[in-house]
Design a protein with these regions (language model features):
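Expand to "…catalyze enediolate/carbanion chemistry for C-C bond making/breaking, isomerization
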Residues: 1-95
Length: 95
């Protein structure tokens, strides 16, 4: 997640859910081609209902970030985005 932080037009630091999912999916594909196993994924997340990363099931947009942007360092997935990503990782891993 560390390599995909972006800034919005108004300068708010964020991450895009689809970019994170793409990064994880690519990692699984690369490991599969190499015959190795991806042993873990590092995610920055919180159990709180923050709006720091865009996308996900609620389709948060840049305009939504100000509603509950609480981080003082890096944007985190909120609890819904984290669960959604975990379910997608499980589906990839079981395919």
């Amino acid at each position: 997640m560390h390599g995909n932080t972006q800034s919005t037009a108004s300068g708010v630091k964020t991450r895009r859910f689809d970019d994170i999912l793409s990064e994880v999916t690519q990692a699984f594909e690369i490991h599969a081609r190499c015959g190795s196993i991806l042993g873990g994924v590092h995610l920055e997340l919180t159990g709180e209902d923050v709006t720091e990363c865009t996308g996900g099931a609620r389709n948060l947009a840049d305009e939504d970030l100000q509603r509950a942007y609480k981080t003082t360092v890096d944007p985190r997935l909120n609890y819904e985005q984290a669960l959604e990503l975990a379910m997608k990782i499980a589906a990839i891993n079981n395919s």
